[in-house]
UniProtKB/Swiss-Prot annotation:
Pfam family of the protein (one): PhyH
Protein name: Ectoine dioxygenase
Region (Disordered) location: 1-40
Assembly description: Homodimer.
Cofactor(s) the protein requires to work: Fe(2+)
Residue stretches in coiled coil: none
Domain of life: Bacteria
Cofactor annotation comment: Binds 1 Fe(2+) ion.
Family: Belongs to the PhyH family. EctD subfamily.
GO biological process annotation, one example: ectoine catabolic process
Binding site for L-ectoine: 133
Binding residues for 2-oxoglutarate: 139
Temperature-related activity annotation: Optimum temperature is 32 degrees Celsius.
Amino acid sequence: MTTTTTNVTDLYPTRGATEVATPRQDPVVWGSPDAPGPVSAGDLQALDRDGFLAIDQLITPDEVGEYQRELERLTTDPAIRADERSIVEPQSKEIRSVFEVHKISEVFAKLVRDERVVGRARQILGSDVYVHQSRINVKPGFGASGFYWHSDFETWHAEDGLPNMRTISVSIALTENYDTNGGLMIMPGSHKTFLGCAGATPKDNYKKSLQMQDAGTPSDEGLTKMASEYGIKLFTGKAGSATWFDCNCMHGSGDNITPFPRSNVFIVFNSVENTAVEPFAAPIRRPEFIGARDFTPVK
């Protein structure tokens, strides 16, 4: 069950006439510092400070192989390709992402339920959690396009109706992330400022934005100010490594013009105490395979 935005205060205005920077109104780490869990106190402090937490090996090499095979099966299945949950690369016409992968695949559903994964999300968010979004991402070599700078929360707030910043994402590498093959970049500390973007949200904006971000894109001036203040960190790591990052981190990735493909599993956990209401700055909700309306906790 959802409510309308008339009952919820909009703490983070966006998609108006001008770009507006708003100081973060929410904690980063919602759980108690001494609560038991797989994340150490030092790592929780680093997450609070930087907005992200890198783990050298979250899953084993054998597990990486299992998930690689499942990714290959899904991305070569004609039925999956024809499904609206699959997003196709504009140039190559190859599958770029498959959404709601934890519902399509029992292999990835088990990963979501793994305590190494969901246990960290519960500890950070201080509550039970549900999956707001899941997907596999494939960035083939020789020209796969990147994704421009953005805050995920800006979109999830504006178009999905998440009221507060009580959401955490994990990107688990299924291939090696080099410093050359279009890896994830984050501005450390940027999660402490919400950059509300200028411009109204078109109807069915999601159809375009999943291939190339437009609405919800920060200005050059806003990005320059943030990058000058916070810097930019590029994430590299072996297959099986993972990056946890706060929903409001300013992040993006470049094109992959190398021969080396890059693929990952991306899971977004939201607190059951922060369930979606009506969109704060969009005419309609996005489809449920992008922004979940099933708030059943992961068990």
